């Protein structure tokens, strides 16, 4: 799988997890409808399924996925919560993505 496809798959996986966790938050903290749990459950099922599509050992996938999750969470902060990321948010995201790239794309024998 190409690097671009791998990163895209990580991004879609992270979005599914964030949506799956955000909807119950809206129900519990914001008083929204309990029916939000239905799309939340579907989103989390999609998240788990998407994890199975990643092209490498599961431990490596989880470790690398963390970097993309951090990035998606900061983008969510900006797009959904309306809070502009700080310089430190961007720096931390960059470090997390660098770690993801090293884990996923470093040359290895196995």
UniProtKB/Swiss-Prot annotation:
One of its GO terms (cellular component) is plasma membrane. The chain crosses the membrane at residues 7-27, 33-53, 63-83, 87-107. It is found in: Cell inner membrane. InterPro entries: UPF0060 (IPR003844). Keywords: Cell inner membrane, Cell membrane, Membrane, Transmembrane, Transmembrane helix. The keyword ATP-binding does not apply. It comes from the Bacteria. NCBIfam families: PRK02237.1. HAMAP family: UPF0060 (MF_00010). Belongs to the UPF0060 family. This is UPF0060 membrane protein Pcryo_1341. The lineage of its organism: Bacteria, Pseudomonadati, Pseudomonadota, Gammaproteobacteria, Moraxellales.
């Amino acid at each position: 799988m190409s690097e671009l496809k791998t990163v895209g798959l990580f991004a879609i996986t992270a979005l599914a997890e964030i949506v799956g966790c955000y909807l119950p938050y809206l129900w519990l903290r914001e008083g929204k409808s309990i029916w939000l749990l239905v799309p939340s459950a579907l989103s989390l099922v999609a998240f788990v399924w998407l994890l199975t599509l990643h092209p490498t050992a599961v431990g490596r996938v989880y470790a690398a996925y963390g970097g993309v999750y951090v990035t998606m969470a900061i983008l969510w902060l900006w797009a959904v919560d309306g809070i502009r990321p700080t310089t430190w948010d961007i720096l931390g995201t960059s470090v997390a993505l660098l770690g993801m790239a090293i884990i996923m794309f470093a040359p290895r024998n196995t």
